[in-house]
C-alpha cells in the first residue's frame, strides 16, 4: 500500500502572468508536483523564457516542496506529419521546449507523438525518430505519452510506444501514461492484470509520470475527454488501483477546470484513494 505522505500528486498549472507564478498557484491547491507549459500552448512559439522570469522560476522552485516539475509540449506540433513545413516547425518547437526546460531547470518534457495523417505507422515512426534524434537533449528527459486511439494517432498501443522508445536511441527518455487515454484506447486499467500488462510492456522504471484522469466516455471509445476523478468510467475503484500499481511515481491531474477549493478537494480525494 502506498504511503500517502510520500505521494507526489498535483495538477497542470497555469503560467498566466509569469511562469514563476505557477509555484504559488500549485502550492495554494496542495500540489506536491506540477506540470506547466513553458510558453503559449496554442501557437508556434519558439521564444525563450526571458532571463528575469527564468531566474525567478529557479528561485521559487527552492521555496516550495513541489517536485518534480514537468513541462508539456504545446498542442500544435506534429512530429509524424507528412507536411514538410509543419514537420520543420514541429521539430523547431520541440527544440525550443527543450531549451526552455534546460533554462528553467525542468528535467522532464511530456510529448505527444503526433499523427501520420494516413501515411501509415512506418512513415510516422520514421518521422518521429528523425525529429527526436535531430534535436539536442540538453539533459532533458523526453516522456512519450500514450494516445487515446484516435484515427492515425501514433502511440495509442503499448507496442507502438515501446517501438518509438527503442527507435530514438541512447538519449534521456521515458514514458508518461495517461489513464484516460489508455482506457479510451481499450486498456481496461480498472483490472490489475491490465495494469500489470502496461508495466511489463514498458518497464516500471521507464514510466516516469502518470497523468491521472478519469474518462468521460467508455472503454475503447477512442475519445480523449478527461473527467474529474471518480466521476467518469474509470471511477474511484479504478483510480485507486492505478495509484497502487504505480506507487512511488508522480501523478499529474489534467481534469476539467474547477475552483481552487474544488481542486483542493479533488486532490484530497485522490490521497484517500491511495490509502
Show the residue positions of the predicted features.
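Acidic-and-aromatic substrate-binding clefts and catalytic sites of carbohydrate-active enzymes
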Residues: 15-21, 41-52, 78-80, 116-121, ...
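Acidic/histidine-rich catalytic cores of soluble enzymes
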Residues: 132-227
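Acidic (Asp/Glu)-rich catalytic clusters
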Residues: 24-31, 50-70, 95-105, 133-139, ...
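Short, electropositive alpha-helical surface patch
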Residues: 85-100, 121-134, 158-167, 193-202, ...
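Active-site acidic/histidine proton-transfer and metal-coordination neighborhood
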Residues: 63, 79-174
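Conserved, mostly hydrophobic/aromatic
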Residues: 26, 72, 90, 101, ...
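N-terminal pre-domain/capping segments
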Residues: 1-73, 77, 81-96
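Active-site beta-loop-alpha junctions enriched in small/polar residues
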Residues: 12-16, 37-41, 74-76, 114-116, ...
Amino acid at each position: 500500500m502506498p504511503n500517502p505522505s510520500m505521494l507526489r500528486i498535483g495538477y497542470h498549472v497555469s503560467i498566466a502572468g509569469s511562469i514563476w507564478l505557477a509555484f504559488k498557484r500549485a502550492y495554494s491547491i496542495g500540489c506536491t508536483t506540477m506540470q506547466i507549459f513553458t510558453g503559449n500552448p496554442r501557437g508556434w512559439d519558439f521564444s525563450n523564457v526571458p532571463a528575469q522570469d527564468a531566474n525567478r522560476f529557479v528561485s521559487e522552485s527552492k521555496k516550495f516542496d513541489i517536485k518534480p516539475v514537468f513541462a508539456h509540449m504545446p498542442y500544435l506540433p506534429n512530429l509524424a506529419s507528412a507536411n514538410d513545413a509543419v514537420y520543420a516547425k514541429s521539430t523547431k518547437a520541440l527544440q525550443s521546449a527543450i531549451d526552455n526546460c534546460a533554462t528553467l531547470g525542468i528535467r522532464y518534457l511530456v510529448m505527444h507523438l503526433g499523427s501520420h495523417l494516413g501515411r501509415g505507422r512506418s512513415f510516422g515512426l520514421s518521422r518521429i525518430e528523425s525529429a527526436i534524434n535531430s534535436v539536442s537533449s540538453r539533459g532533458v528527459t523526453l516522456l512519450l505519452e500514450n494516445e487515446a486511439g484516435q484515427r492515425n494517432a501514433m502511440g495509442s498501443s503499448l507496442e507502438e510506444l515501446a517501438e518509438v522508445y527503442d527507435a530514438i536511441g541512447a538519449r534521456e527518455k521515458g514514458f508518461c501514461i495517461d489513464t484516460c487515454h489508455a482506457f479510451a484506447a481499450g486498456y481496461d486499467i480498472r483490472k490489475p492484470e491490465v495494469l500489470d500488462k502496461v508495466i511489463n510492456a514498458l518497464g516500471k522504471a521507464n514510466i516516469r509520470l502518470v497523468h491521472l484522469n478519469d474518462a468521460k466516455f467508455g472503454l475503447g471509445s477512442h475519445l480523449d475527454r478527461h473527467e474529474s476523478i471518480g466521476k467518469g468510467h474509470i471511477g474511484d475503484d479504478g483510480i485507486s488501483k492505478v495509484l497502487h500499481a504505480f506507487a512511488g511515481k508522480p501523478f499529474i491531474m489534467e481534469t476539467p477546470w474547477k475552483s481552487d477549493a474544488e481542486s483542493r478537494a479533488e486532490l484530497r480525494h485522490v490521497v484517500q484513494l491511495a490509502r
